[in-house]
Regions:
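N-terminal secretory/membrane targeting signals
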Residues: 1-24
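Membrane-embedded alpha-helical bundles that constitute the cytochrome b-like, heme-associated redox core
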Residues: 22-319
């Protein structure tokens, strides 16, 4: 109830706040020369794909390298926050809040940085344990009755890694004060990766029609099966809707959508009402729902592995 009350309050504040219409009016002339932000987006994409690929290779040493890469990515997020974001002073002096929920963004960044740091340490421990394993992973490209195939796994982990990079980046970009020289660059990377995530999710859905998903583990209770099914659908809906609502919000505000060095012009004219409605969805409602569902998804997977000892369920997607 507290969450619903907060979201309703945010919606009212957003609707009546004059500053809400200064969302992100990004102009072509504001971009820095050299397209550095496009190279950053490309490097994040390549690193994410390679990490997902190495994590699901046959050779155990290659999988260890993939786990180390994943740990390095977590440490990179934590280091970016601790050594860069904190130094900007934007957590103490952000862009003026549009809703009461904006005041929670510094705390969210702190939480995500600490989670990334702890996850990096945990992944290094996993890599050390993996290094003692000599088992060859016999994994086909297509899904099997009891586990996902290599294509599904690579898509799953690529999308997951990109989303974990998108979330803190999007939060930080939204608190950067207007007029900051590199504000646009953050939006270029954020929007580019958002378009890619949407494309990969659609590819994943198409692949599911060609290669049947494995059945849920038999050890799960009826309630757990229903929760897993609902969470799975909710994650797909949000992974599709968050990029789409972001594009619609940006278009209604009259700003371009960036994809590497290209700029996609708005498909329709400026609308205050459209900016409010779609901005509320993209910046508040869907992200906070994503935090809840994604957190439940991760905690549920860890519960099956560490508490219930349902190792088969965990290995459906993890090598």
């Amino acid at each position: 109830m507290n969450i619903l009350r907060a979201l309703c309050l945010a919606a009212m504040s957003f609707a009546f706040s004059q500053s809400a219409f200064a969302l992100e009016a990004l102009q072509v002339s504001e971009r820095q020369p050299g397209n550095l932000e496009s190279w950053v987006a490309l490097s994040i994409l390549i690193t994410s794909v390679l990490t997902a690929w190495f994590l699901n290779q046959n050779a155990p040493k290659v999988r260890v390298f993939g786990t180390i890469l994943a740990a390095s990515g977590c440490f990179a997020i934590a280091a970016w926050f601790l050594f860069y974001v904190l130094g900007t002073g934007f957590l103490e002096n952000p862009k003026p809040n549009q809703t009461p929920l904006d005041s929670a963004k510094p705390a969210l960044l702190w939480i995500q940085a600490m989670v990334a740091l702890v996850s990096g340490v945990a992944l290094l421990a996993v890599a050390f344990k993996q290094s003692k394993n000599t088992e060859i992973l016999e994994l086909s490209a297509t899904n099997e009755p009891d586990r996902y195939g290599r294509v599904s796994r690579v898509l799953h982990w690529t999308i997951a890694i990109l989303f974990l990079a998108l979330i803190p980046m999007g939060i930080f970009a939204s608190i950067i004060p207007e007029g900051t020289s590199y504000r646009v660059e953050y939006y270029v990377v954020h929007k580019t990766l958002g378009v890619i995530v949407l494309a990969l999710v659609l590819v994943r859905l198409f692949w599911n029609t060609k290669s049947k998903r494995p059945a849920l583990d038999a050890s799960l209770t009826s309630k757990e099966r229903k929760l897993a099914h609902v969470a799975h659908i909710a994650l797909y809906v949000m992974m599709i809707m968050i990029p789409i609502t972001g594009f619609i919000m940006t278009s209604f505000h009259g700003a371009p959508t960036f994809f590497f060095a290209w700029e996609l012009e708005p498909l329709w004219g400026f609308s205050k009402t459209g900016t409010i409605v779609w901005g509320m969805l993209h910046k508040y409602l869907l992200p906070y729902l994503l935090y809840i569902v994604l957190g439940a998804h991760i905690l549920g997977a860890l519960k099956h592995q560490l508490i219930d000892k349902h190792t088969i369920a965990f290995k459906r997607m993890v090598s």
